[in-house]
């Protein structure tokens, strides 16, 4: 499966937290975001080309040692390409959705 095909599958099988961010924030946000966007060998949850911002909705699997190391390597690659990477846990998205959206909005406004 190519990265593009995998991204398409991920879009069709989004987590509840990804769907919440997409349908309740990004879809109507005035600056365009894409979801499950391939960048190099990686697929990022949300991507804004204009602001060079990536937003990740991190589920429980991101807290195992191997995934922590993978995320660090991926973030370093993305940062080397000029992207700012924002990570939010599913719990943050559930319990502080307004705060998460505010952080994203500020980051976009600072970047464009």
Residue ranges and their predicted role:
Residues 1-112:
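Nucleic-acid endo/exonuclease domains
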């Amino acid at each position: 499966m190519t990265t593009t095909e995998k991204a398409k599958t991920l879009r069709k099988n989004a987590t509840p937290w990804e769907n919440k961010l997409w349908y309740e924030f990004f879809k109507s946000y005035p600056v365009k975001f894409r979801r499950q966007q391939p960048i190099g060998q990686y697929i990022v949850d949300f991507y804004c080309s204009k602001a060079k911002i990536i937003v990740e909705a991190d589920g429980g699997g991101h807290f195992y040692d191997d995934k922590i190391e993978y995320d660090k390597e991926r973030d370093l690659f993305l940062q080397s390409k000029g992207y700012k990477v924002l990570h939010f846990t599913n719990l943050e998205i559930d319990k502080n959705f307004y705060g998460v959206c505010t952080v994203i909005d500020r980051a976009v406004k600072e970047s464009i």
